[in-house]
Amino acid sequence: STNQAAIENAHMNPFLLITFTVIMAPIVEELVFRGLLMGRVFNPDSIVGLIVSSLLFGLVHMPNSIGVWIVYAGMGLALGIAYRKFQKLEYCIMAHIINNSIAVSMLLLLQFLAPYIK
């Protein structure tokens, strides 16, 4: 996605990358998509709220293809289903943090190994 490419090309300080991508983004995104959209705009049990929040979650990650959008919307759907089942925003935040932690760990590992792979 455009979002992922921007992160990869930014060569951001690892501390800032972790702070924003692993901690801040999941908290803000879950507050907006699950807490606000699913919890306040729609009823937490609303299928429409689940679908709208999932589709918008996919779009805000700036997908550059339908396949990438499906991946992000699918993640939004999984987080939305978890929110519907447990109605605990902190569970969604933790799942999102774990997901982003894995992605950032892989990115940092690849950046570290890049000079040795050539």
Task: Please describe what each predicted stretch is.
Residues 1-25, 113-118:
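Juxtamembrane helix-loop-helix connectors linking adjacent transmembrane helices
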Residues 15-19, 47-52, 69-73, 90-94:
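Hydrophobic alpha-helical transmembrane segments
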Residues 16-25, 29, 52, 56, ...:
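Hydrophobic alpha-helical transmembrane segments of multipass integral membrane proteins
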Residues 25-27, 58, 93, 97:
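Hydrophobic transmembrane-helix microenvironments that flank and shape a buried ionizable site
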Residues 28-52, 81-91:
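Membrane-interface helix/loop boundary segments of multi-pass membrane proteins
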Residues 32, 50-60, 75-77:
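Hydrophobic, membrane-inserted alpha-helices
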Residues 59-67:
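Membrane-interface helix caps and helix-loop-helix hairpins in membrane proteins
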Residues 66-118:
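Functionally important transmembrane alpha-helices
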